[in-house]
């Protein structure tokens, strides 16, 4: 409630986001430009208390917000959903923004100063770091594929928290959800025939809403990339 939504568009560089694919070879360039635009926007609006960003894509943002000439310094929260994607790029690319040399050094790799990592700098420059569960937080702490990323996370471990991710079961409650044709609750686990009858009616209502021909093949829904990490093979096995 009472939240304002702002859309940041880079009209002067619209070609950066006019790619035929969601992901491409110039992702770091695109998100460097977006980070710079976001930093300029945040400095131009009335002071905010907290800036919360997600994954490596805006990893440059905290470094830009902590520039010595910044009008104020909001607290910054960095949430990592996927520790495997980190935003490796050239240091030259980041140096073309308004980031100062001190904060730029947080992004550079010690083993190769010409290479920087969006996630690495984001870890060092943020005030708090979160991820999607306590278990995943522990997995991240035990991940050594890049020792410098591991060192960055270990250094910030005192402000690193795993917070269990999930839906709000008060809103998305099958017992009360107004979007369902047939409501049900866990008590129907003891009455499987009635449960499957209700689920069948919900499936039919969904197919009708989507303009699909109803059939008796399994219906599964997942909002995800279809990659090995997500385990799509389990759907087939099910």
Stretches found by the model and what they are:
Residues 1-238:
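Catalytic cores of nucleotide-sugar-dependent glycosyltransferases that transfer UDP/GDP/TDP-activated
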């Amino acid at each position: 409630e009472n939240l304002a939504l702002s859309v940041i568009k880079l009209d002067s560089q619209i070609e950066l986001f006019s790619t035929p694919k969601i992901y491409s070879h110039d992702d770091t360039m695109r998100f460097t430009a977006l980070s710079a635009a976001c930093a300029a926007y945040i400095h131009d609006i009335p002071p905010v208390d907290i800036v919360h960003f997600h994954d490596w894509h805006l990893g440059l943002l905290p470094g830009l917000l902590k520039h010595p000439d910044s009008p104020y310094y909001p607290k910054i929260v960095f949430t990592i959903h996927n520790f495997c994607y980190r935003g490796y790029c050239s240091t030259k690319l980041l140096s073309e923004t308004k980031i100062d040399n001190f904060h730029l050094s947080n992004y550079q790799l010690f083993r190769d100063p010409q290479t920087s990592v969006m996630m690495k700098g984001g870890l060092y420059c943020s005030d708090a770091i979160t991820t999607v569960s306590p278990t995943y937080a522990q997995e991240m702490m035990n991940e050594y594929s890049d020792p410098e990323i591991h060192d960055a996370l270990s250094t910030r471990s005192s402000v690193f928290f795993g917070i269990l991710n999930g839906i709000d079961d008060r809103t998305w409650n099958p017992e009360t959800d107004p979007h369902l044709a047939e409501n049900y609750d866990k008590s129907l686990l003891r009455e499987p025939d009635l449960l499957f009858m209700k689920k069948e009616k919900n499936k039919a209502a969904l197919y009708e809403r989507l303009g699909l021909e109803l059939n008796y093949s399994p219906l599964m829904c997942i909002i995800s990339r279809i990659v090995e990490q997500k385990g799509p093979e389990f759907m087939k096995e099910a």
